[in-house]
Structures are given as C-alpha cells and as structure tokens.
C-alpha cells in the first residue's frame, strides 16, 4: 500500500508490516528486526502471531491511513486495531493503537510503534530524550544505554521523561519528533550499544486498572533543517496550538516565587528516605535499605 497526503508519503508492506515514510526528500523506515509485541500474563505475542490479520486503506475528511485489525492470540479472542494515518492539515503521521476485545489476555505491556532505523555510525546522528534535564546521545557514544538505565524505565511525565516526546536527528539536518498524545500509561524504550553504531527508540504502553481500555496515540512530525532547538520549538508549537502552553512569565505571574528559581541549579539527589513496612518498595530482606539520610 502507498499513498501521499500533504507532502508525506507512506508505504506499507503487508507481508512484513514495515512502514516507510518520505517527507522533504528524506526517507524513514521502521526497523526490519523490531517486532511489535503484546506482553501479558499468558506469555509474549508478536503482532504477527495473530490468527487473523486484515489491512485496509481508509480515507476521511481529516486524512488517509491504513487500518489493521489483529484477532486471536494463543487460545484467546483478544483483538485490537492499529490505525496509521497522515493528518491532512499538517502532514504529520499518527500511530493509533485501539483495543477491541480484551477477553482472554491480561496485558502488561504493548510495544508499538516500531523503532525507526537509525543505524548510521556518525557522531552527528543523535537521539534526544527528556530524561531529567535532557540527554543527547550520539550514535557513536561509547557508553551503552538501555531502558533499564533510564529512571522509571522511561515513563513519560516522570524524571525518566519529563515531557512526552523523543526525537532523532540526522547529520544532514533531517529529523523527527515523536510526541505521545496519550502519555498517562506510557513511556519509551531505548537501545544503544557501546560505541553504537545505532540507537533504537520506541514507545511502550501499559494497562490502566488492569485493562488497555482506551486509544493510545503517538504523533510523528518529520522535520527539515533541524537541530535540538528546532525540536524543542516544534514541541512548544504543538503544545501552544492546543492551548496548554504556560510560559515562565505566566507561571511567575501566578506564583511570584518562580522568579527566584531563574538561574538556580537543579540537582537530582535524595536527602532522606524512609520506606514504610506496608509499602511495595519495602525491603524485608535488607531492612537497613529502607532508611537513609
């Protein structure tokens, strides 16, 4: 399947379920060896393990996309839909994961959409994550980085991902920002081996109160002539368009003490920890670890 909307071309291989996107003369492909999965109490299933998979192109007044329905995993009737479409107004690509029938599986994690192919051994090819004060990882960086190295496994709106986005920038100025529009039960996974030559990053979703129960959405905006500043401006513009931007001046008007924080250092360090015996984090085998100063 192939279509073009507002300057963005999408190609979809129904056999491998890989996507390719072209915009501003740059092509982006999902990783060939990345398998989107459902992790659940009953085991782990790749999307491709579904007993029934259907694909159809869908066109609406807001855009054009590919709707896929996956049904039957193991001995269950569990089913879900993915909808990957281009927004006509912006040319952005939206990835939507939608539960249809949640009977038969107890989902703990959904890994989708797939990471982008970002495998050039160039120290100007970089990945941006909003971990703590922000991290830029060149593809040739000597230190390995995995999801377990990130605070709270990269959960959005925590120290692992204060803002719900990540980005990748190529040496030639092409890049993308992936914005999670439903960040409440979501985060990112990352894989960067020592010295590269690649960095793979993707979104994960988890259930809310035991079920997936609502649509999950990630927006990919492809950029040209981009650097880390352009990425941040793109996110700022996205938030502002939706009426959610709060500038530092506005925050200071509401709370004047904000002005006292300008120019101050921010240090991530614990001062005192006391874990209560009824807490999930209480260590019964090593009680001395439950208190520190």
Positions of PLM-derived features:
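Carbohydrate-recognition beta-sandwich/jelly-roll modules
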Residues: 2-293
């Amino acid at each position: 399947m192939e279509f073009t909307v507002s300057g963005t071309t999408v190609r979809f291989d129904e056999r491998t379920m890989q996507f390719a996107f072209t915009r501003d003369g740059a092509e982006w492909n999902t990783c060939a060896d990345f398998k989107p999965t459902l992790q659940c109490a009953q085991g782990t299933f790749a999307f491709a393990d579904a007993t029934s998979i259907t694909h159809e192109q869908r066109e609406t007044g807001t855009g054009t996309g590919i709707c896929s329905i996956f049904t039957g995993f193991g001995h269950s009737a569990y089913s879900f839909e993915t909808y990957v479409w281009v927004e006509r107004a912006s040319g952005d690509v939206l990835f939507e994961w939608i539960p249809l029938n949640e009977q038969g599986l107890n989902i703990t994690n959904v890994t989708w959409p797939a990471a982008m192919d970002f495998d050039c051994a160039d120290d100007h090819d970089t990945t941006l994550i909003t971990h703590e004060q922000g991290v830029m990882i060149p593809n040739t960086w000597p230190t390995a980085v995995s999801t377990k190295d990130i605070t709270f496994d990269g959960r959005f709106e925590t120290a692992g991902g204060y803002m719900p986005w990540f980005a990748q920038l190529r040496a030639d100025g092409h890049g993308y920002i992936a914005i999670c529009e439903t960040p409440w039960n979501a985060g990112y996974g990352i894989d960067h081996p020592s010295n590269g030559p690649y960095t793979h990053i993707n979104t994960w979703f988890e259930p809310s109160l035991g079920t997936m129960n609502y649509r999950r959405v990630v927006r990919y905006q492809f950029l040209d002539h981009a650097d880390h500043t352009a990425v941040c401006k793109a996110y700022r513009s996205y938030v502002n368009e939706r009426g959610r931007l709060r500038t530092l001046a506005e925050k200071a008007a509401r709370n004047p003490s904000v002005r006292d924080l300008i120019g101050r250092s921010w240090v991530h360090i614990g001062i005192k920890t006391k874990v209560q015996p009824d807490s999930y984090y209480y260590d019964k085998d090593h009680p001395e670890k439950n208190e520190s100063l």
